């Protein structure tokens, strides 16, 4: 969707949101509006390196740890990831076990879906302080998934592992990223929000990456930057300054 230059960015986005909310879309389809950035918003690129971990593990770290931390940097609009394998937990249902226990596949699906959400509660007030109640329910590993209760039959809990085989897998790969002598890497691209100062954003990014490398990531995992727009920005500023001085002198 292209708007004229004089249209305010936030007004334009709100109009798009309103039209999307009124659109008649199939069940399960949730439209998204991209973050606010321009065609020259790409300012930083990096890869992940580890001598011990697979690209699937690195992709998981990228999606769940690095992306969330880099998005918190002021001026960053989005983090775009390429390469690696997206880890999934796969449930292979045994139809004979479903029949034996009298459980439908929909009941199994609902039990897993309801056990994989975070829920907000109320607030408990004690003395002069208020404590927020929150239920953490996201599944972290295979054992948690295997031990989800699907149904109680005569006081006996029927678990997912009684009905299906649960194992780790990945989504179908749509491509692969290579760099230098590595033919399969995980790459991240940082996109700057429209109107921000690229020099300040890049400096803050470098500070955050140093913090992640030293204090947050596993010892064998490192973020390796290989491109940033700082040199281009400095050269452009130097050129403009030089031309202005020449123009004044002439």
What are these model-derived regions, one by one?
Residues 1-248:
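Membrane-proximal extracytoplasmic
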